[in-house]
């Protein structure tokens, strides 16, 4: 791959602007599209000659959803498109499930400014990229004794939305699954993580994210 055509997707215009300005400093990168929701992204993908999609994990879009659901749809319908996830979500269980989707990289928005250019440079060489900030988080969940109890992508998606404040009924509607299915996936995830109630689950999700000292 010589010049790299990139699409950016994020529901915050200022983030789109910042990413584009950052990528404009890389002479071999061309930004060929910017989208603020998943529906616009999917509708325009067939029209664009893109090599890489840089997408937020949490992004509105009624028809195609976001997160793991969106990534799986894109990989199924646009298999040649490389995907780099850019996210504020630093929960290791969720990040691990996203990486299990065989994406090309994941970058934290609160990570080093050089992480995204490094991810693209690695991709240009045919390699995947996991920044140190993400590697530290994945080590954290292993240290907590949950390394052999990996969440499924569907379980991780339910926990991501639960951590964002969605109720089980709202998650069911958003993911187009039954309330019974969502409840079962949430319960299964809680059993794997060794937590018995919602408060303990929220405490766990909070405890395994980066603390201020982790960011130094």
Swiss-Prot record:
Location of 4-aspartylphosphate modifications: 56
Keywords: DNA-binding, Phosphoprotein, Transcription, Transcription regulation, Two-component regulatory system
SUPFAM superfamilies to which the protein is assigned, alphabetical: C-terminal effector domain of the bipartite response regulators, CheY-like
Pfam families tied to this protein: GerE, Response_reg
NCBIfam families: PRK10840.1
Subunit structure: Interacts with RcsD and RcsA.
Chain's role: Component of the Rcs signaling system, which controls transcription of numerous genes. RcsB is the response regulator that binds to regulatory DNA regions. Can function both in an RcsA-dependent or RcsA-independent manner.
Protein name in UniProt: Transcriptional regulatory protein RcsB
């Amino acid at each position: 791959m010589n010049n790299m055509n990139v699409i950016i997707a994020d529901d915050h215009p200022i983030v789109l602007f910042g990413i584009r300005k950052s990528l404009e400093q890389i002479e071999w990168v061309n930004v060929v599209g910017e989208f603020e929701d998943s529906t616009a992204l999917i509708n325009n993908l067939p029209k664009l000659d893109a090599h890489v999609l840089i997408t937020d994990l949490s992004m509105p879009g009624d028809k195609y959803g976001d997160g793991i659901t969106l990534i799986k749809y894109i990989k199924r319908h646009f298999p040649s498109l490389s995907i780099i996830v850019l996210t504020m979500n630093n929960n290791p269980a969720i990040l691990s499930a996203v990486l299990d989707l065989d994406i090309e990289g994941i970058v934290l928005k609160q990570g080093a400014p050089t992480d995204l250019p490094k991810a693209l440079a690695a991709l240009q060489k045919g390699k995947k990229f996991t920044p140190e900030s993400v590697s530290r988080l994945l080590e954290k969940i292993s240290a907590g004794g949950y390394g052999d109890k990996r969440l499924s992508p569907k379980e991780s998606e339910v926990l991501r939305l639960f951590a964002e404040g969605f109720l089980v009924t709202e998650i069911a509607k958003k993911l187009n699954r039954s309330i019974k299915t969502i409840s079962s996936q949430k319960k299964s995830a809680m059993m794997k993580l060794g937590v018995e109630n919602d408060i303990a689950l929220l405490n766990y999700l909070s405890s395994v994210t980066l603390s201020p000292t982790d960011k130094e």
